[in-house]
Curated annotation (Swiss-Prot):
A motif ('KMSKS' region) lies at residues 236-240. PANTHER family: TYROSINE--TRNA LIGASE, MITOCHONDRIAL, TYROSYL-TRNA SYNTHETASE. This is Tyrosine--tRNA ligase. Keywords: Aminoacyl-tRNA synthetase, ATP-binding, Cytoplasm, Ligase, Nucleotide-binding, Protein biosynthesis, RNA-binding. One of its GO terms (molecular function) is tyrosine-tRNA ligase activity. It catalyses: tRNA(Tyr) + L-tyrosine + ATP = L-tyrosyl-tRNA(Tyr) + AMP + diphosphate + H(+). It is found in: Cytoplasm. L-tyrosine binds at residues 39, 176, 180. A motif ('HIGH' region) lies at residues 44-53. The gene is tyrS. Catalyzes the attachment of tyrosine to tRNA(Tyr) in a two-step reaction: tyrosine is first activated by ATP to form Tyr-AMP and then transferred to the acceptor end of tRNA(Tyr). Homodimer.
Length: 417
């Protein structure tokens, strides 16, 4: 890989964001001589992005920090189809109302990372439904479809692997890569965008856009993809044992978000500090030198910095303090997740097994049972080893709540109503 002249590509390289670039010399020269507008597309198939999207959001963050213009593309049009890249089956089709509602919720996250406005490097959020939903199908086939080879499209890994596993690929989904390529050209026409970024699974789709632009007479367009990250143990980023690590606070509490990053494996701490925080590299190198139990301090800094970017510094510090009190002082922190229960249920007693599942601490009764038998469940910091144990009114403490603990790191406050 080249030693880059431009600040943006230097940061991308130094921090580990780069998987592939379509033309390293050409892109570096472009970034060195002018303000570059670039974009990443986000799929609005849920009402929140999850932590797997943070890598791309940080790429946009650094793009703006180094004096360039990041564009957020919401797939309001392509979302009606769903990206088939490396999926074994078709996604559930959403309505336009579903997607519009999801986009409204997702937009809030980007304001934490990007500056929006009318200045040259200010960001904006664009919805590809603006042009895709008004296309004339016959004109599109004639003017755009003629530039795509089905033979070549079938050779892309995202399609080939699915067909080799004998999973069907609908004509609807097959059109996705054509629409994404068209997005790139349309965004150049409307906003002067010269580069698309994305995960490495999007390489084929982005290259399609570059080639379409060449055939339609645009200036040279560029691709930059990031690696598809997993943890050192092979787990997919953005997923936990309890499901997706959502970015919206109404879908995952800031405390749970902080805790996800606090539980980072030792081998991943330095890599994640580079990718997910704006900390200077010299500070990251100092933290990476920590060994043994000292690495836990680096994990706390990692969790707090990532949470601060998403939820604000004050709240990040508050949840870090909650964690400290919970784990080090065994007291109740203000930001622990809460689960509300009918107070009448406690008069007769509620089964501990059921409550562990309902409160989201355990995925199943059998998992809860194993933890109880192993001494891993506590009620108000007292170990409970009886799987038939009932939670009753007398368990309510002076603060009017009941603290449930599942293992060392998962806690919920039960609040009777």
């Amino acid at each position: 890989m080249l030693a880059f002249k431009s600040d943006f590509l230097n940061i991308m390289s130094e921090r580990g964001f780069i998987h592939q670039i379509s033309d390293e010399k050409g892109l570096d020269a472009l970034f060195s001589k002018e303000v570059v507008s670039a974009y990443i597309g986000f799929d609005p198939t849920a009402s929140s992005l999850h932590a797997g999207s943070l890598l791309q959001i940080m790429m946009l963050y650094w793009l703006q920090k180094t004096g360039h213009r990041p564009i957020v593309l919401m797939g309001g049009g392509t979302g009606l189809i769903g990206d088939p890249s490396f999926k074994d089956e078709a996604r559930r089709l959403l309505t336009q109302d579903d997607i519009a509602a999801n986009i409204a919720d997702i937009k809030k996250v980007f304001a934490r990372y990007l500056t929006f406005g009318e200045r040259e490097t200010d960001s904006c959020i664009v919805n590809n439904a603006e042009w895709l939903c008004t296309l004339n199908y016959l004109e599109f086939l004639r003017d755009i479809g003629k530039h795509f080879s089905v033979n070549r499209m079938l050779s892309f890994d995202s399609v080939r692997l699915r067909l080799e596993r004998e999973h069907s690929l609908s004509f609807l989904e097959f059109n996705y890569m054509i629409l994404q390529a068209y997005d790139f050209v349309e965004l150049y026409k409307r906003y002067g965008l010269r580069m698309q970024m994305g995960g490495s699974d999007q390489w084929g789709n982005i290259i399609n856009g570059i080639e379409l632009g060449h055939r339609l007479g645009t200036p040279q367009l560029y691709a930059l993809t990031s690696p598809l990250l997993t943890t050192s143990s092979g787990a997919k980023m953005g997923k936990s044992l309890n499901g997706a690590v959502w970015l919206n606070a109404d879908m995952l509490s800031p405390y749970q978000f902080w805790q996800y990053w606090r539980n980072t494996e030792d081998a991943d701490v330095t890599r994640f500090l580079k990718l997910y925080t704006p900390l200077p590299m010299d500070e990251i190198l100092k933290l990476s030198a920590l060994q043994g139990t000292e690495i836990n301090e680096a994990k706390k800094i990692l969790a707090t910095e990532i949470t601060a970017m998403l939820h604000g510094r004050d709240l990040a510090n508050a949840v870090a303090e909650t964690a400290r009190k919970t784990f080090e002082e065994r007291t109740l922190g203000e930001n622990l997740p809460t689960f509300e229960i009918n107070a009448n249920d406690l008069k007769m007693g509620t089964g501990l097994l059921i409550l562990l599942v309902q409160a989201g601490l355990s995925k199943s009764n059998s998992e809860a049972r194993r933890h109880i038998q192993g001494g891993g469940v506590r009620v108000n910091d007292h170990i409970i080893e009886d799987e038939t144990h009932l939670i009753r009114e007398e368990d309510i403490n002076a603060q009017g709540i009941i603290k449930l603990s599942f293992g060392k790191k998962k806690h919920v406050l039960i609040k009777p109503l």
